[in-house]
Amino acid sequence: MEPFRIHKGTAAVLMNDNIDTDQIIPKQYLKRIERTGFGKYLFDEWRYDNERHENPNFPLNAPDRKGASILITGDNFGCGSSREHAPWALADYGFRVIIAGGFADIFYMNCMKNGMLPIVMDKEMREKLAKTDAREQIEVNLENEVITTSTHRFHFTIEKMWKEKLLNGLDEISITMQYEQEIKEYERMVAVY
C-alpha cells in the first residue's frame, strides 16, 4: 500500500446522508475479485441514465468536478451491506480522501485498508469546505491532522493505529511480514501432528 502523508487535490461534493454501498457500487458489478475496474461503475445509477449517458445534474459529472480526488459527503456514508467493492470503486475512480459526518464502521476500516483516508467532520465545517472553488487544490495533511484551503484550516482526528498504518503504507500483509522471523521460529517450535 502506498504511504499517505500529504494529499493535494480538488473536491467533489455529494452532501447526501445515508449513501449506502449499493448506491456507491450496485450489486450487478460485484462479480470480480480484482480491486481495479470498478471506478467506472461508481454511483452508477446516479451518474448515468438508462442508455448509459452521463446525467448532467449529478455532481461528479460537472466538468469542473471531474478528476476530483477528495469527496465531501453527508452523514453515515458507506452504510448498508458490507462490501469491500465500495472502497475499491471510490479508489479506482481516483478518490484518496472521503470527508463525511460519519461512516459505517466496516466501510471506514475498509477505506483505510485500501489506502484511502476517511475523515469525520461536522456539518458546519463540511459546508464551509464544500464552498471551496472547484478548481482549488485542497491540502490534506495526515501527519498534522489538518485540511487547508486558501481561506480555511480544518483540524481532524484519527485513531493513532490507523494513522500509523496510513503514514507508513502498512496493510495486514505487510504488518505480518514484519514478524516473518518470529513466525518461522514459532513454526519450528510447534509440533506437527
Swiss-Prot record:
It comes from the Bacteria. Its EC number is 4.2.1.33. The keyword Lyase applies. Pathway: Amino-acid biosynthesis; L-leucine biosynthesis; L-leucine from 3-methyl-2-oxobutanoate: step 2/4. Pfam families: Aconitase_C. It catalyses: (2R,3S)-3-isopropylmalate = (2S)-2-isopropylmalate. SUPFAM superfamilies: LeuD/IlvD-like. The keyword Endoplasmic reticulum does not apply. Keywords: Amino-acid biosynthesis, Branched-chain amino acid biosynthesis, Leucine biosynthesis, Lyase. GO terms for cellular component: 3-isopropylmalate dehydratase complex. GO terms for molecular function: 3-isopropylmalate dehydratase activity. InterPro entries: 3-IsopropMal_deHydase_ssu, Aconitase/3IPM_dehydase_swvl, AconitaseA/IPMdHydase_ssu_swvl, IPMI_Swivel, LeuD. Heterodimer of LeuC and LeuD. Belongs to the LeuD family. LeuD type 1 subfamily. This is 3-isopropylmalate dehydratase small subunit. It comes from Bacillus cereus (strain ATCC 10987 / NRS 248). The gene is leuD.
